[in-house]
């Protein structure tokens, strides 16, 4: 039974290795292109449709490389605190991606390019800040070693690429004063410059094992860029494409096309691998509106026009790009690569076989670990103890050390494996259990916490209190000054104590003196509503009302129609005429010497001839029964008209 089980396990390992080494269209992961954006890795199929995203927990992704032998993607995060380079693998059972730290951060690295050697399982990367190219194995915790040091010569390594079959490393030197494309053996020997002329700022570079050529991006002067290629020794240099208004970073090559990421347009572009213009160094410059100094021959068309194709629009700035090439299947019979492919396959199969055998032998221990030790704890059968991972404790690793550790903050495990709290604004202490305002403000002061973490909290003091913590009682301080002022009248008392001393003097004037300041009324708030102001205001209002009344009355008198004046003339004589029986003194005109004429304008002013205004007889008759209105009608009896 053991032999049968062992044979089945070996067969399973071989089948698994075969699946890992199948071409792109047969992979269970079903992606063909992977692009790093700023905060994620985006996977796309052959038609550039997004099928998955991963690495969302990272903040500043940049470089990217791919190991087809084990389906591992290696990428860099510029802002991660602990790690510099990470690996990403698809979990077929859980259908998700698992990211693990591969290279720890040792300083302020700035990775420009990444490359992987599947034979020795080494990662190579360029550091644009230190101006060096490093390498380190993906397993273990070995310190990265320097393969190429360009700092002394002022170089700036950018893109890197590994020629797996010929065991060489290629890189671009983007130093604008002396740009180059160079190579070196993977053991650090035989460094060679293969391109050093007619180049401005080379960026990404890739080795095409199918055509045995190099492809790189050159960020030309001005707004131009180009994609060029040459043989692996630098000969047969060709310009595949020259265009403008792009800011390309990295590129990838398939069997028939070139793909590159563009930061300006946030897109991935493609162009056939067929070159458009061949470059030499002995011909006249190309006649076009360009600011670079590259010498070109007359354009020699190599094929039909091949326009650019924008294959993918991205939501963020595009950076690294890798493509699945089916390297291990297509190069099995290549005379340069056959031996390397065979060795890689053997290593993968052997590695998986050892893994399966070890799993079989440790199966019982694994069960014990799962049942006995929680949270990934390691079970020690000899001592029957659990070795807990960082962040857990207890006999079975069941207690999370950060659980309820920080009262007002976030808990993280420190480098020394101790829980550490990062407090919220306004709190402090080892466990963020103390408020920065606790006991700070005295005497009822209100504590204010600024949003700026570097600014200390402040106190807003109530009335009659001051100081940074409201610890100064103005009443007590001023009472001391005012008591001393009682004995030393010339002593200076702060101005703010005046009102306080007045209040204290009302209760205890024997011991309290009120300071008198010259021109104190200038400093005090003026009293507006005094008695004189009120009197003047009232007089002004009354005068204004009287003036308005006079004006209104005058206007009414001016526009009121005049009443007509009634004039009556009466002739009075002493002797009546004898020749007329009907003559009476009131009807006969008197003689010239014996008569007078009375002109009556207003009965109310009958004082001219001392003649009464009313007829006496009628007055006597109607006195008892006439009203005031009837009196007006008897103002002179026998008048020709009724005046009223």
UniProtKB/Swiss-Prot annotation:
GO CC field: plasma membrane
Record SUPFAM superfamilies: EGF/Laminin, YWTD domain
Residue ranges of the TM segments: 532-552
Keyword Cell membrane: yes
Cytoplasmic domain ranges by topology: 553-644
Protein name: Protein cueball
SMART domains reported for this sequence: EGF, EGF_CA, LY
Any one GO molecular function term: Wnt-protein binding
């Amino acid at each position: 039974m053991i032999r049968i089980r062992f044979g089945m396990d070996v067969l399973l390992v071989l089948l698994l290795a075969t699946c890992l080494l199948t071409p792109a269209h047969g992979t269970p992961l079903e992606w063909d292109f992977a692009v790093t954006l700023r905060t994620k890795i985006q996977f796309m199929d052959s038609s550039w449709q997004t099928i998955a995203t991963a690495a969302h927990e990272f903040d500043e992704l940049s470089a990217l490389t791919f190991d087809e032998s084990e389906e591992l993607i290696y990428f860099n995060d510029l802002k991660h605190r602990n790690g510099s380079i990470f690996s990403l693998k698809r979990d077929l059972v859980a259908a998700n991606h698992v990211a693990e730290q591969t290279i720890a951060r040792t300083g302020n690295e700035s990775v420009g390019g990444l490359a992987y050697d599947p034979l020795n399982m080494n990662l190579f990367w360029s550091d644009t800040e230190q101006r060096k190219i490093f390498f380190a194995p993906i397993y273990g915790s070995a310190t990265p070693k320097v393969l190429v040091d360009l700092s002394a010569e002022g170089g700036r390594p950018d893109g890197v690429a590994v020629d797996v079959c010929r065991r060489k490393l290629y890189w671009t030197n983007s130093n604008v004063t002396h740009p180059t494309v160079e190579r070196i053996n993977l053991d650090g020997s035989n460094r060679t410059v293969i391109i050093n002329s007619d180049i401005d700022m080379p960026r990404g570079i890739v080795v095409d094992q199918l055509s045995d050529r190099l492809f790189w991006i050159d960020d030309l002067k001005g707004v131009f860029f180009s994609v060029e290629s040459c043989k692996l020794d630098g000969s047969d240099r060709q310009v595949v494409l020259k265009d403008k208004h792009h800011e390309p970073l990295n590129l990838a090559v398939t069997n028939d096309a070139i793909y590159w990421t563009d930061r300006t347009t946030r897109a991935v572009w493609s162009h056939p691998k067929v070159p458009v213009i061949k470059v030499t160094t002995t011909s006249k410059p190309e006649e076009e509106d360009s600011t670079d100094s590259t010498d070109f021959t007359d354009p020699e068309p190599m094929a039909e026009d091949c326009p650019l194709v924008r294959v993918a629009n991205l939501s963020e700035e595009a950076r690294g790009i890798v493509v699945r090439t089916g390297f291990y299947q297509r190069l099995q019979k290549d005379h340069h690569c056959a031996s390397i492919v065979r060795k890689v396959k053997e290593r993968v199969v052997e590695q998986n076989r050892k893994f399966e055998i070890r799993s079989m032998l440790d199966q019982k221990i694994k069960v014990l670990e799962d049942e006995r030790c929680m949270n990934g704890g390691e079970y020690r059968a000899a001592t029957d103890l659990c070795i807990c991972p960082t962040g857990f404790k207890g006999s079975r690793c069941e207690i999370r050390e950060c659980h309820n550790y920080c009262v007002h903050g976030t808990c993280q495990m420190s480098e020394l494996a101790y829980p550490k709290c990062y407090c919220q604004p306004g709190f402090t202490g080892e466990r963020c259990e103390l408020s920065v305002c606790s006991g700070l403000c005295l005497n009822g002061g209100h504590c204010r916490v600024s949003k700026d973490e570097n600014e200390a909290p402040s106190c807003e003091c109530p009335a009659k209190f001051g100081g940074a913590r409201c610890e100064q009682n103005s009443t007590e301080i001023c009472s001391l000054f005012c008591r001393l002022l009682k004995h030393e009248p010339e002593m200076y008392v702060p101005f703010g104590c005046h009102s306080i001393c007045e209040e204290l003097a009302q209760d205890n004037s024997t011991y309290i003196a009120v300071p008198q300041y010259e021109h104190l009324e200038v400093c005090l708030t003026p009293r507006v509503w005094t008695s004189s102001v009120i009197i003047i205001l009232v007089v002004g209002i009354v005068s204004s009302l009287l003036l308005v009344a006079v004006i209104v009355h005058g206007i009414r008198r001016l526009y009121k129609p005049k009443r007509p004046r009634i004039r009556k003339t009466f002739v009075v004589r002493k002797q009546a005429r004898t020749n007329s029986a009907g003559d009476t003194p009131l009807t006969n005109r008197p003689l010239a010497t014996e008569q007078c004429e009375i002109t009556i304008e207003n009965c109310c002013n009958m004082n001219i001839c001392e003649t009464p205004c009313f007829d006496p007889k009628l007055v006597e008759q109607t006195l008892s029964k006439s009203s005031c209105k009837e009196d007006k009608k008897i103002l002179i009896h026998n008048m020709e008209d009724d005046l009223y």
